Amino acid sequence: TFQNHTPLTFNDVFSGIAPSLAAATSVLTPITFLIQNTFGPITLNSLSLEIVSSEETSTATIERVWLDTYRIRPALDTTLRIVTRTHRGVEETHSLPLRIPANAPATVSLLVASGVDLAQIEQQGTIGATQPRNLNQLIRALNNTYRNNRLYVRLLGAHPGVLLAGEPLAALPASALAVYQADRSRGAVMSLQQASLGEWEVDTQEAVSGFRILTLNLDSQ
């Protein structure tokens, strides 16, 4: 915990090569970022850790994904099925209810990814990732760091937007997009090619890797 600030939280799984080092790094790195941040002073009050260790490998890969509904349309409630396979070959099916937004474009992509893979995709600049511009944003970003034991689901559409003052503004009307891109007095503006129309997470018991993408052509009827 930090004095007069939101506490940092940790909940993750590390497995494979040097998991102890990875776990220690995951704790020390965000604390170091905050202590050495350039936005303002911050004081560490306390640190509480609960560690569970095991001799067994605990990893899984994303094998396949599909939707229960064959004809997909805007404003539809459906269920996403995600199959993961452990290093021992055991498959597990995860179910995630989700809703296709009413304003979704004719073609959307459904991305299911591990935290590592999602971070790499965001670094390519096609999906907006928040860039901290102050201490509160930095703490929020660190608490939202992608974890190994999560399945991250993103519904993506070709709605251009901008990254403004560290915050993604997606699915902007053409007129608003032109204003943001022309008005440099607001600070650095970066164009985004895709908008996240929906975001979900699924907890797992393993450290997950891999990603799958479904391209969906929405039925207008």
Which residues does each PLM region occupy?
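Long, low-hydrophobicity ectodomains and other hydrophilic envelope-associated domains
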Residues: T1-Q221
